[in-house]
Structure formats: structure tokens, C-alpha cells
């Protein structure tokens, strides 16, 4: 499916943690619904303004009932600084969904015990993945590592079997997995989006 380019409207642009924002927008194109692991490009500045490229941001959550998409992003440069300035009712350019994402039906047909592992802002697309896995009948175990305090973890508790998160320089996601390892886990297929 080809990506759509629409003008999206901001509902909220909340500070979640230092330099971390949760942007909620209305996505008017229901024919181009995103799924886990896909991303959009976001642009809140003119075509003749810097930076030259739009910012690719993964889908944190898609809510088809309200036609809203949430983007969890880190403010690290000029483009994301401009996105962080967006306020309620602001309009901006949103193009997507793009990328292959995760093939949830294939994953749940092959694996009955699944661990979702991530770190820092790389956990952003894992919420939609966890939701889709749970909706397909497999509640995964979630293991995340963060440089500083964990964020957005409460929302996982309702849809995951087990949720473990750690922080600090000595707690990468793999180490958290070893400490909180659930019985029955073994190495399996990994995915990237």
C-alpha cells in the first residue's frame, strides 16, 4: 500500500520525561491505517525551511475508534525541537504509514511465548506491537532498559503477561531480560522495523 500525505491536527503534545514527548494527532485517512512497526514522516515547518528532511517517527499507538495516532519521540535536534513546539489544534504534514512493520499473524502462528525487548526511545513502536500480539491471543513478556527512569510502562501492564524495566548505564535491555527471564523463553526469531 502506498503512503498517504495528509494534514494532521494535534490533540496533545505532552512531556513524558526529560526530552521525551508523546504527540497525539488525528489521522483522517482511515484507508491507510498503520500497524505495529510502521512509521510516518512528520513535518511542522515549511518546505524552504531547515531541516531539509521530514522526521521519521514510529507509531506508538493507533486507535481506529478515534482515528488518532500517538508518536513517542525524543527531542534531539532541530527537527524534533520544531515538533516539540506543536500545540493543540496546530496542523502539520504527516506522511505514511511506511515500512513493513511486524507480521503479527505470522508471529503468533509460530510462537506461543513471546518476549518484547527494547531500550530507551527504541521502545516506542513496541506498545503497538504488544497491543496487536495481545489482541491476537498472545500476551507477551516485556523487558525494557532505559538510561534514566523508565517511562510509559503502566500502559503495558494491562496487555502484557509480564513487565520488567530497569534503568541506568548497567541495565541494557538484554541484562533486564536475564534478570527477569520467564520460564519457557528461548531464543527465537527477532524482528526489526
Regions found by a protein language model. Give the residues of each.
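Ferredoxin-reductase
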Residues: 1-88
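FNR/FR-type flavoprotein reductase catalytic core
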Residues: 78-193
Amino acid at each position: 500500500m502506498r503512503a498517504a500525505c495528509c494534514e494532521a491536527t494535534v490533540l496533545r503534545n505532552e512531556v513524558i520525561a526529560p526530552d521525551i514527548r508523546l504527540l497525539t494527532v488525528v489521522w483522517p485517512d482511515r484507508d491507510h491505517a498503520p500497524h505495529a512497526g510502521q512509521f510516518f514522516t512528520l513535518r511542522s515547518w515549511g518546505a524552504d525551511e531547515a531541516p531539509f528532511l521530514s522526521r521519521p517517527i514510529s507509531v506508538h499507538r493507533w486507535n481506529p475508534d478515534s482515528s488518532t495516532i500517538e508518536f513517542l519521540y525524543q527531542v534531539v535536534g532541530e527537527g524534533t525541537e520544531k515538533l516539540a513546539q506543536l500545540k493543540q489544534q496546530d496542523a502539520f504534514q504527516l506522511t505514511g504509514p511506511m515500512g513493513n512493520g511486524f507480521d503479527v499473524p505470522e508471529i503468533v502462528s509460530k510462537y506461543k511465548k513471546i518476549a518484547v525487548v527494547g531500550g530507551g526511545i527504541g521502545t516506542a513502536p513496541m506498545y503497538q506491537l504488544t497491543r496487536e500480539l495481545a489482541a491476537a491471543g498472545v500476551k507477551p513478556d516485556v523487558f525494557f532498559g532505559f538510561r534514566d527512569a523508565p517511562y510509559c510502562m503502566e500502559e503495558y501492564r494491562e496487555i502484557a503477561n509480564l513487565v520488567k524495566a530497569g534503568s541506568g548505564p548497567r541495565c541494557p535491555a538484554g541484562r533486564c531480560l536475564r534478570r527477569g527471564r520467564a520460564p519457557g523463553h528461548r531464543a527465537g526469531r527477532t524482528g526489526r522495523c
